[in-house]
């Protein structure tokens, strides 16, 4: 290490140690503009929200707080729910990390589901809303955390031995012809492209 050349711009280890002892390093989280005045911040936010509401009210001549049209350049008409595309009135999707708890679904120890959620037109009926599911029994909320951890995409296997990526098969099992003996499925290989030698 005696042949290592240290550039003149970098401080020696003695100077670095002395600097660290004199000036303790401040925390990485610093307040650059002084203490936060939460009351002023709240007032500014409320004022900004009111300004945005007024701007959108003037732009669209619609009172968004009371859900009523106003006089102006746009003419608002009430439209029936059935004449709109489905995405305007369907319930919003839960976030990706959220737990899905379908109604009346039970699960056994191995992780297999007993009843699944409604699919297709059954799930999109007008009577089915997220609000209705929330107003069910309050004791269903207690099992929510337990169900979130218990639901699996794949059922648990009964076999405790690890699965091999490639199954070992003997010629006896293959030639046996019985369905149980050679039940392991093998992926066919792609035929290699062979060049003609001329």
From Swiss-Prot:
Classification via InterPro entries: CDI_dom, CDI_dom_sf
Motif Nuclear localization signal, chain ranges: 153-169
Record key words, sorted: Cell cycle, Cytoplasm, Endosome, Nucleus, Phosphoprotein, Protein kinase inhibitor, Ubl conjugation
Keyword Nucleus: yes
Modified residues (Phosphothreonine): 157, 170, 187, 198
This protein's record includes keyword Nucleus: yes
GO BP annotations, alphabetical order: G1/S transition of mitotic cell cycle; negative regulation of cyclin-dependent protein serine/threonine kinase activity; negative regulation of epithelial cell proliferation; negative regulation of mitotic cell cycle
Location(s), subcellular: Nucleus; Cytoplasm; Endosome
Modification after translation: Phosphorylated; phosphorylation occurs on serine, threonine and tyrosine residues. Phosphorylation on Ser-10 is the major site of phosphorylation in resting cells, takes place at the G(0)-G(1) phase and leads to protein stability. Phosphorylation on other sites is greatly enhanced by mitogens, growth factors, cMYC and in certain cancer cell lines. The phosphorylated form found in the cytoplasm is inactivate. Phosphorylation on Thr-198 is required for interaction with 14-3-3 proteins. Phosphorylation on Thr-187, by CDK1 and CDK2 leads to protein ubiquitination and proteasomal degradation. Ubiquitinated; in the cytoplasm by the KPC complex (composed of RNF123/KPC1 and UBAC1/KPC2) and, in the nucleus, by SCF(SKP2). The latter requires prior phosphorylation on Thr-187. Ubiquitinated; by a TRIM21-containing SCF(SKP2)-like complex; leads to its degradation.
Phosphotyrosine: residues carrying this PTM: 74, 88-89
GO terms for cellular component: cytoplasm; endosome; nucleus
Main subcellular localisation: nucleus
Compositional bias segments (type: Basic and acidic residues): 13-22, 126-137
Comp. bias (Polar residues): 1-12, 104-113, 175-186
Residue span of region Interaction with CDK2: 51-91
A GO molecular-function annotation: cyclin-dependent protein serine/threonine kinase inhibitor activity
Residues with PTM Phosphoserine: 10
Region (Disordered) residue spans: 1-30, 87-198
Entry function: Important regulator of cell cycle progression. Inhibits the kinase activity of CDK2 bound to cyclin A, but has little inhibitory activity on CDK2 bound to SPDYA. Involved in G1 arrest. Potent inhibitor of cyclin E- and cyclin A-CDK2 complexes. Forms a complex with cyclin type D-CDK4 complexes and is involved in the assembly, stability, and modulation of CCND1-CDK4 complex activation. Acts either as an inhibitor or an activator of cyclin type D-CDK4 complexes depending on its phosphorylation state and/or stoichometry.
The record's note on its domains: A peptide sequence containing only AA 28-79 retains substantial Kip1 cyclin A/CDK2 inhibitory activity.
Quaternary data: Forms a ternary complex composed of CCNE1, CDK2 and CDKN1B. Interacts directly with CCNE1; the interaction is inhibited by CDK2-dependent phosphorylation on Thr-187. Interacts with COPS5, subunit of the COP9 signalosome complex; the interaction leads to CDKN1B degradation. Interacts with NUP50; the interaction leads to nuclear import and degradation of phosphorylated CDKN1B. Interacts with CCND1 and SNX6.
Family stated for the protein in its record: Belongs to the CDI family.
Protein name: Cyclin-dependent kinase inhibitor 1B
Gene name in the database record: CDKN1B
């Amino acid at each position: 290490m005696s042949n290592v050349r240290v550039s003149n711009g970098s401080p020696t280890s003695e100077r670095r140690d002395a600097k660290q002892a004199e000036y303790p390093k401040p925390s990485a989280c610093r307040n650059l503009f002084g203490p936060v005045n939460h009351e002023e911040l709240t007032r500014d936010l409320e004022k900004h929200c009111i300004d945005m509401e007024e701007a959108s009210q003037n732009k669209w001549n619609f009172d968004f707080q009371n859900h009523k049209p106003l006089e102006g350049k746009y003419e608002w008409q009430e439209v029936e729910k059935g004449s709109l595309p489905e995405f305007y009135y369907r319930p919003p999707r839960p976030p990706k990390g959220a737990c899905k708890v379908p109604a009346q679904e039970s699960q056994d120890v191995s992780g297999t589901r007993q009843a699944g959620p409604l699919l297709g037109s059954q799930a999109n009926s007008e009577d089915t809303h997220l609000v209705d599911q929330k107003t069910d029994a309050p004791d269903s909320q207690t099992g929510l955390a337990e169900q979130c951890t218990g639901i699996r995409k794949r059922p648990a296997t009964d076999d405790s031995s690890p699965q091999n990526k490639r199954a070992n098969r003997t010629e006896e099992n293959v030639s046996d012809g019985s369905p149980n003996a050679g039940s392991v499925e093998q992926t066919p290989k792609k035929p290699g492209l062979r060049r003609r030698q001329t």
